[in-house]
Amino acid sequence: MYLHYTLLHQTNLKHILIKLLKSYMLALSVIVIVKDAEIDIQRCLESVKWADEIIILDSGSQDNTLEICRQYTQNIFSTDWPGFGVQKNRALDKAQGKWVLSIDADEYLSDRLIEEIQWIISKSENRYDAYAIKRISFFCGKKIRYGDWYNDKVVRLFRRLPYISFTPAIIHENLNGYLHLGELKQAIFHNTMKTISQVLLKLEQYSS
């Protein structure tokens, strides 16, 4: 009985140490929430495939989204849809990296932004615990040059700390809790609605 307890204790301790070591070694976790995103998700994941960990949280995709995601990660989880803020926090809870990058399925990183993020997370000393990123949006294939989406900035890169999380908003969630905010020079691309039919579908989803 004592031997069995000792072996069980050693096994549990080993698993804990492995998990801690893995967490220590991971520099960056990427979190993505998805649903029926087969049109955009491959370009998104292709731009972050260099990350140490990719976490996918799906809320009931009926298209080929999950098949595409499996080409990039096995960390795929299915859940209900409580809204953007809660869903992103669920994905954040599963991340193990020192840094976290939250990216939407219809976004992707520029090559220069990839280099800048890699430089940021490799620094041994850094006073910032979160970074705002310029976002360049496209509507029906055209770059948006006016309105709220022009000169848009989103806080998406941040340290994985217990006091940093997303607001529990259904839409238009924000990151909260960071103390020192930096700003990256390079941009993330946002390929928003590509056709008028997508615009009408989005309006219907938000009004229902």
Language model segments and positions:
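Acidic helix N-cap motif at the loop->helix transition within catalytic regions
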Residues: 40-42, 63-72, 112-113
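Catalytic-site signature of metal-activated, phosphate-bearing donor transferases
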Residues: 86-92, 99, 103, 110-208
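A conserved acidic beta->alpha catalytic loop
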Residues: 38-39, 47, 58-67, 104
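Short hydrophobic targeting helices and cationic amphipathic motifs
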Residues: 3-5, 10-13, 17
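Conserved donor nucleotide-binding strand/loop of the catalytic core
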Residues: 66-96
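Short beta-strand/loop segment that forms part of the nucleotide-sugar
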Residues: 44, 51-60, 77, 105
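N-proximal low-complexity "stem/linker" segments adjacent to membrane-targeting elements
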Residues: 16-46
